[in-house]
Amino acid sequence: DAVEAAKLLDITLTTRGQMDGVPIKMAGVPFHAAEQYLARLVKMGKSVAVCEQVGEVGAGKGPVERKVVRIVTPGTLTDAAFLEDKETNRIAAVNADKKHIAIAWASLQSGEFKTKLTTADKLADELARLQAAEILLPEGKSLPDGFHATSANITRLNSWQFAADAGAKLLTEYFGCQDLHGFGLDGKEHEAAVGAAGALLNYIRL
């Protein structure tokens, strides 16, 4: 909100109008510098929703209608101007069932989109190798003790988003195929990987 943005970006907090007798707090930046401020917020681990005006000024009483047209998160930042030289900005998802642990990861810069099965004792090393800027986890789940996510932002999603059947539907629709046999993900042992990939795909398509 405006209070948090003003504090994080060191910009002026103002008020304009009232709602239920309480002043409405606002904070703004110059339009030409908006992308730079957006990148700063994302680098701090914040997710930013970009809205555009879609209603006509004076068309009715109350605020002009606006619509969310873009959501930027730590793992979906792609503008090379705001990334370190040669830095690949990855986002990953971790999922597990009773027998298997899986990681799916993607880079919106390069189009990379992969998934693999791993084990509990190797998960920390796999995540460290990927150096993902953002890691998606089901609610109630945590990363292994051996992994210290000093540079990764953890985003928790509803557990149903990691379901294998939902993931398979999303993946086959997106890639235009009847099943996941061609990707080597059609076995029971790959359900955790399909769930991770589906949750990741759904998130980055927002």
Residues of each region from the PLM?
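Charged catalytic and DNA/RNA-contacting regions of genome-maintenance
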Residues: 1-206
